[in-house]
UniProtKB/Swiss-Prot annotation:
Taxonomic source organism: Synechococcus elongatus (strain ATCC 33912 / PCC 7942 / FACHB-805) (Anacystis nidulans R2)
Entry-linked NCBIfam families: DNA_YbaB_EbfC
Family, similarity comment: Belongs to the YbaB/EbfC family.
Protein name, as recorded: Nucleoid-associated protein Synpcc7942_0464
InterPro entries found in the cross-reference section: YbaB-like_sf, YbaB/EbfC
Location in the cell: Cytoplasm, Nucleoid
Sorted UniProt keywords: Cytoplasm, DNA-binding
Presence of the UniProt keyword DNA-binding in the record: yes
SUPFAM superfamilies the UniProt entry points to: YbaB-like
Keyword DNA-binding: yes
Superkingdom of the source species: Bacteria
GO molecular function, one term: DNA binding
Subunit comment: Homodimer.
Length: 113
């Protein structure tokens, strides 16, 4: 039993060190991705731009713009236009988020990411 230590060979220690290094890279990268997403402004629109909404990359609503012509459409239609613009912005922000996360995890060799 002498000389066996804790059962970690130098190769295993290197693997462990590499795993910690990758985890640190992911953590640092995730902070940067979060900051990038917070700073993004993603536009969603409906009916050719009659209604526009902007959200951050984290899907936080930022502002909305409604063309005067849209106000003449009535409350029900206007509600549908706002919902459609929000859905458009949501889908775009989700795609941006996915793209950023894929870029973060690419090349790290982490299974399942």
């Amino acid at each position: 039993m002498a000389g066996k230590g804790f059962g970690f060979s130098l190769g295993k220690m290197k693997e462990l060190a590499d795993a910690f290094k990758k985890a640190q890279q992911v953590q640092e990268g995730a902070k940067q991705v979060q900051e990038d997403l917070n700073n993004m402004e993603i536009e969603g629109q409906a009916q050719g731009g009659l209604v526009k909404v902007w959200v951050s990359g984290n899907q936080e609503p930022l502002r909305a713009e409604i063309a005067p012509e849209a106000l003449n459409e009535g409350a029900e239609v206007l509600s549908e236009l706002v919902a459609a613009a929000m859905k458009d912005a949501y889908q775009k922000s989700t795609a941006a988020m996915k793209e950023k996360m894929e870029a973060l995890t690419a090349g790290l060799g982490i299974p399942g990411l």
